[in-house]
């Protein structure tokens, strides 16, 4: 769920967010 929060924070972290989301 943290990934979602990061995504809203910024879109430059979208790459990292997607990777984290898959793991979660």
Swiss-Prot record:
E.C. numbers: 1.15.1.1
Assigned keywords, A-Z: Antioxidant, Copper, Cytoplasm, Metal-binding, Oxidoreductase, Zinc
Catalytic activities: 2 superoxide + 2 H(+) = H2O2 + O2
GO annotation, cellular component aspect: cytoplasm
Compartments reported by the entry: Cytoplasm
Molecular function (Gene Ontology), one example: metal ion binding
Coiled coil regions in record: none
Cofactor binding: number and manner: Binds 1 copper ion per subunit. Binds 1 zinc ion per subunit.
Top EC group: oxidoreductase
Required cofactor names: Cu cation; Zn(2+)
Function: Destroys radicals which are normally produced within the cells and which are toxic to biological systems.
Assembly and interaction partners: Homodimer.
Protein family membership: Belongs to the Cu-Zn superoxide dismutase family.
Name of the protein in its database record: Superoxide dismutase [Cu-Zn]
Organism: Aquarana catesbeiana (American bullfrog)
Gene (UniProt): sod1
């Amino acid at each position: 769920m943290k990934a979602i929060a990061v995504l809203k924070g910024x879109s430059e972290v979208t790459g990292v967010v997607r990777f984290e989301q898959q793991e979660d």
